[in-house]
Amino acid sequence: MLKYPDYLSKLISLLRKLPGIGFKTAEKLAFELLDWDQDQLEAMGQAFSEVSAARSHCSTCFCLKNLPESNCEFCQNNRDTSTLCIVATPKDIFSLERSQIFKGHYYVLGTLLSPITGKHIDVERIGLLKQRIEFLKPQEIILALDATLEGDATALFLKQELAFSSASISRLALGLPIGLSFDYVDSGTLARAFSGRNPY
C-alpha cells in the first residue's frame, strides 16, 4: 500500500483544504515544495505566520487592511460617495479594482445567502450596512454579486432590506454568465458587466 512520509501526507492534506484543489493537484504542489531550498520554505512559512498574526478587516467596509490602521485604503482615500458597491468577499473588491472602472465606496457582506445550505448573512453586518448607507447617502447602490442561485437570493434579500434608502439599486449584468463566480471572470469582462449594469 502506498504510504507517504508523515510530513508529506500532512502537507498534501492541508493543501487539499484550499478551494479547487484535489488530491492530484495537492500532491503535485507538495512535491514541488520539496524541491524548494530552505530559505524559500522558511519565507513561505513566515508569510503564513504573518497572515495569521496580521489578518484584519476594515472597521468601515470590512475589506482587508494593514495593521494598525482602523480603515482600509479604500475608505481612507478620497473616493466618490455617490456610489456604494456591495460585494460578498474582500477578494471581490480587488477583482473590481483591477478593472479600474469603479471609483466609489465598497461594503463587504462576508458571505452570500444560500437557500440550500441555510447560510445567512450576519444580522450585525446588515445593520452596519444600513448605517453606512445613511452616512454616505449614495445615489446608487450596486450589487456586485455572483450570477448564481446564492447571488440571486442575496440580491433579493438586500433589495428588501435596503428599501428604506432613496438610492437606486442596480446589479451587474452584461458579460456575467449564469452560474459563474467572480473568481473566473477576467477584469475586462467585469468592466463591461459593470458598465452594463441594470436597475434591480
Swiss-Prot record:
Superkingdom, taxonomy of origin: Bacteria
Protein family according to the UniProt entry: Belongs to the RecR family.
Gene coding for it: recR
Name the UniProt record assigns to this protein: Recombination protein RecR
Keyword Amino-acid biosynthesis included in the entry's annotation: no
GO biological process terms, semicolon-separated: DNA recombination; DNA repair
Key words, A-Z: DNA damage, DNA recombination, DNA repair, Metal-binding, Zinc, Zinc-finger
Role played: May play a role in DNA repair. It seems to be involved in an RecBC-independent recombinational process of DNA repair. It may act with RecF and RecO.
Sequence ranges assigned to domain Toprim in this UniProt record: 82-177
Alphabetized InterPro entries for the sequence: DNA_Rcmb_RecR, Rcmb_RecR, TOPRIM_dom, TOPRIM_RecR
ZnF (C4-type) ranges: 58-75
Upper lineage: Bacteria, Pseudomonadati, Chlamydiota, Chlamydiia, Chlamydiales
GO molecular function: DNA binding; zinc ion binding
